[in-house]
Amino acid sequence: MADDNLLLYSSGLKKVLQMPARHENNPVIPNDKPWELAIGYCSVHRDPTTGEYACWYQSYAGNRAQDPTRRVTLCYATSKDGLTWTKPKLRLFDFNGDLDTNIVLVGNGGRSVNYGASVLFDPTDNQPGKRYKLAYWDFTENEGLQTPGLCVAFSPDGIRWKKHSKAPLLQGSYGEPTQPPFSNESDHLPAGRPAISDVMDLMWDPVNEQYCIYSKTWIDGPDGRRFWKRAVARTTSKDFINWSQPQLILSPNSREDHQFHGASIFYEGGLYLGLLQKLDLG
C-alpha cells in the first residue's frame, strides 16, 4: 500500500487493501521435468512488441543430477497470457544426457549453487549482446577455496548467456558457517559487511541512472552472534561490473519479527515500491 504522497485531497476517502486471489490452476509452471525437483526465484518480462511473456526460474535437481553443474540451473519458459506456459526444448544444456531441456545456464562447478538468479531487460544498452543482464549467486574456485558471491552474465535474447570472466564480483556469505558442508566458511568470510547472500533482485534505477541489486544478507544478534537473522542489503553499479559495498536497508527489529529473505523493488509513478519476502520459520 502506498502512502498519501500523490494524493492532493483525501477527505472522505477510505483506503482499502485489495487482496490478491490465487489462480485456481496454480502452479502455472509445474515442476514436471527430471531436472525440476523444485523451482522458484522467477524473473518475468513482457515483450512490448509481441506481448509475449518470458520467465526465467531457478530449478533445483539436487542429487538427481549426475553432473554437479546441473544441481541448480536457470530455466526458461514462455507464455502468451501469463497462465499457460511452454518450456521450449532449447538443446543448449543436457541433463543426465538428455539435451531436450529448457536450461539456459548451469553452475560454475565445485559447490555449484547457481542460485537466486535475477534477469533484467535493458533496451538502452548500445551493445546488443548485453540487452539482457543476469545476476546470480554461485561458488567460484579461487586459490583452492570455493568462494561464494555475485556473478553476472549477458545475453542478446535472454536465452544464450555468456558469463562474465571475473567471478565473484562481490564476495558473499552463504549463511551459518557451523552447518555442514560450510564448516570452513568462517575461515574466509567477506572483509566488508554486510555482505550479499544467495537471494538477489535486480532493478534499473532511472532517477540515479544505475543498476541496483537488493540482496538477502545476514545481521548479527543482540548477543553478537553471527548469522542471526536474514535482512535486505543494497548494492549499486553504473556498468554492471563494478559494484558498491552493500548497505543494510531493511532488517528485523525484534526477536519476534519475521526474517526478511529478499525484496523486489521497482520505480513507478515517482515512487520506489517494493515487494518484501518475509520468512517465517514457525
Identify the role of each PLM range.
Residues M1-H258, F266-G282:
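Beta-rich carbohydrate-recognition and catalytic domains
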